[in-house]
């Protein structure tokens, strides 16, 4: 009987020494139910411990990096309106069929393009077939005035002139009309470019390929 009592007591002591369910502290990308489950300054976002965008921590940076097109990694981050955006100094390599995202830009004065086009310090009509390229593809202005060939997934293609940079380094200010920095794989086209490709600009972003014309 004494042995049974000792066994029960030993089992009881073992059980109370275990941490309660959910009390384990998770590090980057570990499971969580609330911020108390996460280590240090990490917070619980969609069931995983991650950096707090409002605090601006980068504890989890590089822990499980999302793959970037062409191996071009972010050079930093820019926080605007409480949301963190990656910045880039580079873009994927240009090929005879470079994958990209086509977005829509208003190149006229007062439009969402912000200031005048960088290539010629002028505003442009949206009836022109013109584009802005991500910082890496803009390449310090070396493609200014040059024509590129854009092909949509519907098979249609159009030639357009490079007149501006879609800034991947800066944003969220008056110069950029409050827009966040561009991703590193953007071809920002005028209304005329979208129309020539038979695309609805209200879609916002579509997959394309492009090359030098």
Curated annotation (Swiss-Prot):
Q: Which residues carry this modification: 4-hydroxyproline?
A: 65, 67
Q: Which family does it belong to?
A: Belongs to the kiwellin family.
Query: Where would you find this protein in the cell?
Result: Secreted
Recorded hits in PANTHER family, A to Z, give: RIPENING-RELATED PROTEIN 2-RELATED
What range does the record give for the signal peptide?
1-24
Query: Any idea what job this protein has?
Result: Kissper is an anion-selective pore-forming peptide.
- Pfam families for the chain: KWL1
Gene encoding the protein: KWL1
Cystine bridges: which residues? 28-60, 32-44, 38-49, 72-90, 80-172, 119-144, 166-182
Protein name, entry field? Kiwellin
What does the UniProt record tell us about how this protein is modified after translation? Undergoes proteolytic cleavage by actinidin to produce kissper and KiTH. Three forms of KiTH are produced by cleavage at different sites.
Q: Which domain of life is it from?
A: Eukaryota
- Enumerate the UniProt keywords alphabetically: Allergen, Disulfide bond, Hydroxylation, Secreted, Signal
Q: Where is the composition biased (Polar residues)?
A: 93-107
- Give an example GO cellular component term for this record: extracellular region
InterPro entries reported in the protein's UniProt record = Kiwellin-like (IPR039271), RlpA-like_sf (IPR036908)
The question of whether Secreted is a record keyword is answered with yes
- Where are the residues of the annotated region Disordered? 91-121
